[in-house]
């Protein structure tokens, strides 16, 4: 084998280098996205801490334990209300109960009639 690389060798090296660069670029983007997600999560937690009383926070945590998707939806609603300025003061446990009742998905009931 001679000391000079062939065209095929050069092309293979280029492909490997391009793949490495793509991977490195992808890692940087995913790290930035992760950092942005963490920052948004921290901001959401701060807003919830500021707007909810201890009792309301406990009730929300209980809802999240039993129904995580519904709990997340309630959190998003509270954050949206707080950011738009539609919440005066703090949300106590009674207001949280009302909010949960309003947001509760309609349960489907089935009437079975026997003949």
From Swiss-Prot:
Composition bias (Low complexity) maps to 29-41
Q: Does the keyword DNA-binding apply?
A: yes
Pfam families assigned: dsDNA_bind
Q: List the disulfide bonds.
A: none
InterPro entries under this entry?
DNA_bind_arc (IPR022889), PDCD5-like (IPR002836), PDCD5-like_sf (IPR036883)
User: Disordered: where is this region?
Assistant: 1-46
Q: Which GO terms describe its molecular function?
A: DNA binding
> Where do Acidic residues bias regions lie?
1-11
Source organism's superkingdom? Answer: Archaea
**Which stretches are tagged as biased composition: Basic and acidic residues?**
12-25
For this UniProt record, the keywords arranged alphabetically read as follows: DNA-binding
Q: What is one GO cellular-component annotation here?
A: cytosol
- Per the similarity annotation, which family is this? Belongs to the PDCD5 family.
Recorded protein name is: DNA-binding protein NP_4416A
According to its UniProt entry, this protein's organism is Natronomonas pharaonis (strain ATCC 35678 / DSM 2160 / CIP 103997 / JCM 8858 / NBRC 14720 / NCIMB 2260 / Gabara)
């Amino acid at each position: 084998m001679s000391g000079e690389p062939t065209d095929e060798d050069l092309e293979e090296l280029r492909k490997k280098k391009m793949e490495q660069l793509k991977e490195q670029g992808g890692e940087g983007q995913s790290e930035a996205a992760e950092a942005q997600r963490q920052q948004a999560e921290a901001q959401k937690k701060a807003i919830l801490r500021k707007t909810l009383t201890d009792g309301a926070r406990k009730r929300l945590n209980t809802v999240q334990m039993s129904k995580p998707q519904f709990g997340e939806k309630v959190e998003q609603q509270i954050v949206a209300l707080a950011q738009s300025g539609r919440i005066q003061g703090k949300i106590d446990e009674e207001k949280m109960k009302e909010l949960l009742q309003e947001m509760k998905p309609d349960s489907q009931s089935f009437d079975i009639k026997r003949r």
